Design a protein with these regions (language model features):
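Primarily the active-site beta-strand->alpha-helix module of PP2C/PPM metal-dependent phosphatases
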Residues: 24-80, 152, 164-176
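Conserved beta-strand-loop-short alpha-helix elements that form
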Residues: 33-45, 109, 144-167, 218, ...
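Short active-site loop/helix that positions an aromatic residue
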Residues: 260-270
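C-terminal catalytic subdomain
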Residues: 160-244, 248-250, 270-390
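Acidic loop->beta-strand submotif enriched in PP2C/PPM serine/threonine phosphatases
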Residues: 18-31, 125-164
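Short active-site oxyanion
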Residues: 103-104, 248-253
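Catalytic core of PPM/PP2C metal-dependent serine/threonine phosphatase domains
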Residues: 21, 52-121, 138-139, 190-218
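Regulatory cytosolic signal-relay segments
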Residues: 1-19
Length: 390
């Protein structure tokens, strides 16, 4: 076992005028350090394509979750998928990325654009072996992983972007490589890299995609622990225990809440220094405690972080806000979304008397709900989450 992990981001653009996407992505965790990503592209667009791509990805991911070999999965799906009598091609193509113990990647590709691998900021031509299964050419590759490797899987909507419009022959694979290479060493998350790629595809389509367009980016990175403390414990006698556990953990430490930060400052025997800067008038200012990486207000700030997290999982349109702003919510978002891989929440159950004012839209249940919903969003981002209550 090593300290590498996978950071995964994906997004789709629907064919112009269609409610459903004809591409589908399934992600299956086999264990803590092995994961399978399946991208399927159904023939055509609309409902039929959506059903066929979903069927393809579900069959492959389900078989792999059951422990079957990749060759068996490929053989089954290749033999199962029919070939269109008119077009002479399979009803659904697929790309499989399997990361084993965060040490090796297995790539299986059938009729989708070949996966791009960026290594050390440049395109890396990995070896491919051709398998012939039931008359279908399947490309297979095995690659030893390195930190900062970036895999880009895509449907043919990406390489068709701009065809007959801004580009005569579409956005070819080599063009996508040239476009993405400058972003490889910047440190962007997989989701951000994926958003950059899909936004460019959408521009080439002039906002009216002529095909379902999907990209999935997987970035290999080292694990980074993060710790967030919010709320004092329900039993005041547990303050020392809660603080000892929190500050003993490896990684950066975030303290949220006025009372909580006062307790943390007392525990560390350091002064709590408030700031008067309001980078965002909607978010209370941060404070500073020596030995703590970030000190913020509680419920209002976390509520904003939750909104950013929900948007991040959707279209990531708020990225341009939280990626550079200096308010507490934006700083927490950068730490949790971009830096952290393993996040420990320490949640105090004490009731804040100030929140019991019936004229305020804040109460104890809202604080618990915010933590639960934020934890769920972070899990969907692929983070390992542990929540401890006091």
């Amino acid at each position: 076992m090593n300290d590498l992990c996978t950071d995964i981001g994906y997004r789709s653009l629907n064919h112009d005028g269609e409610q459903l996407c004809g591409d589908h992505i399934d992600i299956v965790e086999q264990d803590d350090d092995s994961i399978v990503v399946v991208l399927a592209d159904g023939l055509g667009s609309g409902v039929k394509a959506s059903i066929l791509s979903t069927l393809t990805s579900k069959i492959i991911s389900t078989m792999m979750a059951a422990g079957m070999k990749i060759e068996d999965c490929v053989s089954t799906i290749a033999a199962t998928l029919p070939v269109c009598s008119v077009r002479g091609v399979a009803y659904s193509t697929f790309t499989i990325l399997r990361f084993v113990q965060n040490r090796e990647a297995e790539i299986i590709q059938y009729d989708n654009p070949h996966v791009i691998l960026l290594r050390d900021g440049q395109n890396y031509e990995y070896p491919r072996t051709v398998m012939n299964i039931d008359g279908k050419e399947i490309y297979s590759s095995r690659i030893t992983l390195r930190e900062n490797d970036i895999f880009i899987a895509m449907s043919d909507g990406c390489i068709h972007a701009g065809v007959g419009m801004k580009l005569n022959f579409g956005w070819e694979r080599k063009d996508i490589i040239n476009f993405m290479e400058p972003f490889a060493n910047v440190g962007f998350t997989a989701k951000t890299l994926d958003t950059i790629l899909l936004d460019e595809c959408n521009k080439l389509y002039d906002g009216h995609p002529g095909d379902d367009t999907t990209a999935c980016v997987v970035r290999i990175r080292r694990r980074e622990p993060m710790n967030l403390l919010i709320g004092p414990p329900s039993n005041p006698d547990d303050c020392s225990k809660m603080m000892s556990l929190f500050f003993s953990k490896e990684g950066k430490h975030i303290v949220c809440g006025g009372t909580t930060s006062s307790i943390a400052a007392e525990f560390l025997h350091k002064p709590l220094v408030p700031t008067v800067d309001y980078p965002d008038p909607e978010i209370p200012p941060i404070a500073r405690i020596e030995g703590v990486d970030l000190v913020t207000e509680g419920v209002i700030t976390i509520n904003k972080v939750l909104k950013y997290a929900q948007d991040y999982l959707a279209d990531n349109e708020s990225y341009t806000q939280w990626s550079y702003k200096k308010d507490g919510a934006s700083q927490i978002a950068r730490l949790l979304f971009e830096e952290a891989t393993d996040i420990n929440f320490y949640v105090g159950r004490a009731v804040n008397p100030a929140h019991q004012n019936p004229n305020l839209p804040i109460n104890f249940n809202i604080k618990m709900r915010l933590v639960d919903e934020l934890s769920t969003c972070l899990k969907q981002m692929g983070k390992r989450i542990k929540v401890s209550y006091f």
